[in-house]
């Protein structure tokens, strides 16, 4: 089986081979090394990220393991509380999702009954979901005639003499709990079908859930330390045996990984006496060091590890940066060379444990020398980029593209006086993320040629992006940028699926779409009903001029970095869900998808096999490569 995976990795440059590789990754984690000997753990959740950063056909596959199970169990995705909007019908009133729907109903009745309104104004009513407690309060205020009665009890003739009573239909709704509907007209009432929605858009639009990008850029830190984790191969999978730091100590333990990690954390704690935040800088640490430690992270150690952040029980924070994501694809030695430090080799990862023990003294020395070189290169690069991309600082970002684009957007915002905002809590972020679709939409599995947008940068730099805080609207306004919760119905005739949905048997579903995607889907014949939207009244104008100025500045500093950065920006939008320019990525991806669809409109649908926001697979027999296709490149 190892031989089979090794062959697949060497030829993983087409969709079919990569899909076969994914099948293995459902059962195994691939242990691989690059040319410099740096370990890479490849699993189902990170293969796409790895392929966006490097050519995986050049990696050496060392082995397979089933032991790193923590990496195969994805962390739970935060879920917003399901939401039902308020419905005020002539026959009934259904309050929006609330912990106390009965209180909402009595307040609604007070709009029509002045004596209830007066009682609510004079006397407070405690929040409660108990009908008997509400009735007790009404009775104590001389308002017993408005007592709450359940619909089923009323139909049993028990309360017919109370003509003014508040009749409520009681129900339990999954993932929401108890809900009540006030029945205004018994003659015309039938229990309504209420849309249970994944988001409360009105809540998400609240001002306090949005912050200006510029306000998050002015951050400082005290200390930077380079770090590397080394792993050996054992019968139970890869095992960390050494953690090296510079400036700092080297920790070695072949007998207990728990003790190795605890000693490292104790040292971190000791050096944080004068600061609450330090920066650890690794190289390819997101691909090996951090996931390997995550597998062995001890319970109840006083620290939690969340992706690239360590947080202690007393609030101290360690940001673990991966300098590789700022290298534009350079090897460690090339990165050090291009940023002015002496390139040094490092110990190989994923060697046998017995070999690591035998050579440990030389490994410790070699690791320290390599980390010193990385430290000097990183300090030089961070100083240079923080001048060119002020006020952006490297440690605030997870990769160079994110830092570069944020600096461009911030500069345009300053010049125009219109700033971009970003969501500050999990639910509002999740709503924005839900509008981003990076998946391939499969039409058929015929043999195809792959085409990619020639320059993503050209497309996205000439478009407009949201400025300011969003407003809640029931339906978006044509010509304005907005993101809406939508009920989507697919066309009944044969069609190319434009809106991604993972259930082929469902013809109507609820999803989040940008105004750009709504326009594209409508052109494709979809029926879309908007169920609430975040809308922006102002736009940041096109970024092209500022983008070109920024590229020129970096080019003057380092041509290799600039050329590689430009290539990455042209080929990809590497979406990052923790980015403060999340809104930019959302609309940039939608603009690219609209462009892909405009090309698909010129091609007979029988020739289209699959597509994503930046790529299009066309049947090999298709020969009519028109002028529009000149904006794509064949891979």
From Swiss-Prot:
Induction: Expressed in the early phase of the viral replicative cycle. The keyword Membrane applies. The keyword Membrane applies. It holds the Pfam family Pox_F12L. Keywords: Early protein, Host endosome, Host-virus interaction, Late protein, Membrane, Microtubular outwards viral transport, Viral release from host cell, Virion, Virulence. It is found in: Virion membrane; Host endosome. GO terms for cellular component: host cell; host cell endosome; membrane; virion membrane. InterPro entries: Poxvirus_F12L, RNaseH-like_sf. Its main location: virion. SUPFAM superfamilies: Ribonuclease H-like. GO terms for biological process: microtubule-dependent intracellular transport of viral material towards cell periphery. Plays a role in intracellular enveloped virus (IEV) transport to the cell surface through microtubule transport. Together with protein OPG064, forms a complex that interacts with host KLC2 (kinesin light chain isoform 2) to engage the kinesin-1 complex and thereby promote IEV trafficking. Belongs to the orthopoxvirus OPG056 family. Interacts with protein OPG164. Interacts with protein OPG064. This is Protein OPG056. It comes from Variola virus (isolate Human/India/Ind3/1967). The lineage of its organism: Viruses, Varidnaviria, Bamfordvirae, Nucleocytoviricota, Pokkesviricetes.
């Amino acid at each position: 089986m190892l031989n089979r995976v090794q062959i697949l990795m060497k030829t993983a440059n087409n969709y079919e081979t990569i899909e076969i590789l994914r099948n293995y990754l459902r059962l195994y984690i691939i242990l691989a090394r690059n040319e410099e000997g740096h370990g890479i753990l490849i699993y189902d959740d990170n293969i796409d990220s790895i392929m966006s950063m490097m050519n995986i056909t050049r990696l050496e596959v060392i082995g397979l393991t089933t032991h790193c199970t923590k990496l195969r169990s994805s962390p739970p995705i935060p879920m917003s509380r399901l939401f039902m909007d308020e419905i005020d019908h002539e026959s009934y009133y259904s309050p929006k999702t609330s912990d106390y729907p009965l209180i909402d109903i009595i307040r609604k009745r007070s709009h029509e009954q002045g004596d209830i309104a007066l009682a609510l104004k004079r006397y407070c009513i405690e929040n409660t979901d108990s009908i008997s407690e509400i009735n007790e309060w009404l009775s104590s205020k001389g308002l017993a005639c408005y007592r709450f009665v359940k619909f089923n009890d009323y139909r049993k003739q028990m309360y017919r003499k109370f003509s003014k009573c508040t009749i409520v239909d009681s129900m339990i709704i999954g993932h929401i709990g108890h809900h009540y509907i006030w029945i205004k007209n018994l003659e015309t009432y039938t229990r309504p079908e209420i849309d249970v929605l994944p988001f409360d858009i009105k809540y998400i639009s609240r001002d306090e859930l949005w912050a200006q990008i510029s306000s998050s850029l002015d951050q400082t830190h005290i200390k930077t330390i380079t770090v590397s984790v080394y792993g050996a191969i054992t019968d139970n999978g890869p095992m960390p045996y050494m953690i090296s730091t510079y400036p700092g100590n080297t920790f070695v333990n072949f007998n207990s990984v728990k003790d190795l990690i605890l000693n490292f954390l104790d040292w971190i704690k000791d050096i944080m006496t004068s600061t609450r935040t330090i920066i650890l800088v690794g190289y390819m640490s997101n691909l090996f060091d951090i996931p390997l430690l995550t597998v062995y992270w001890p319970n109840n150690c006083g620290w939690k590890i969340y992706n690239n952040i360590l947080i202690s029980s007393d609030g101290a924070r360690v940001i673990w940066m991966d300098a590789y994501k700022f290298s534009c694809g350079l090897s460690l030695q090339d990165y050090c060379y291009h940023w002015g430090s002496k390139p040094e080799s490092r110990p190989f990862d994923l060697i046998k444990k017995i070999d690591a023990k035998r050579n440990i003294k030389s490994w410790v020395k070699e690791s320290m020398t390599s980390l010193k070189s990385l430290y000097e290169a990183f300090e030089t690069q961070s100083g240079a980029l923080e001048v060119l991309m002020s006020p952006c600082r490297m440690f605030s970002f997870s990769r160079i593209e994110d830092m570069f684009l944020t600096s461009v957007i911030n500069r345009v915002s300053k010049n125009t006086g219109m700033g971009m905002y970003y969501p500050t809590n999990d639910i509002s972020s999740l709503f924005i993320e839900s509008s981003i679709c990076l998946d391939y939409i499969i039409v058929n599995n015929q043999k195809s040629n792959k085409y990619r947008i020639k320059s993503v940068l050209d497309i996205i730099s000439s478009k407009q992006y949201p400025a300011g805080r969003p407003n809640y609207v029931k339906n978006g306004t044509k010509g304005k940028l907005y993101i809406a919760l939508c009920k989507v119905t697919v066309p009944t005739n044969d069609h190319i699926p434009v809106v991604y949905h993972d259930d082929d048997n469902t013809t109507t579903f609820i999803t989040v779409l940008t105004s750009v995607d709504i326009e594209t889907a409508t052109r494709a014949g979809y029926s879309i009903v908007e169920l609430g939207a975040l809308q922006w009244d102002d736009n940041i104008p096109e970024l092209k001029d500022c983008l070109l100025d920024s590229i020129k500045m970096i080019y003057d500093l380092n041509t290799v970095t600039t050329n590689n950065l430009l290539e990455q920006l042209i080929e990809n939008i590497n979406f990052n869900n923790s980015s403060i320019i999340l809104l930019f990525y959302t609309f940039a991806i939608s603009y690219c998808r609209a462009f892909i669809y405009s090309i698909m409109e010129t091609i007979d649908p029988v020739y289209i096999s699959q597509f994503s926001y930046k790529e299009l697979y066309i049947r090999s027999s298709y020969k009519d490569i028109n002028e529009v296709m000149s904006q794509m490149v064949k891979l």
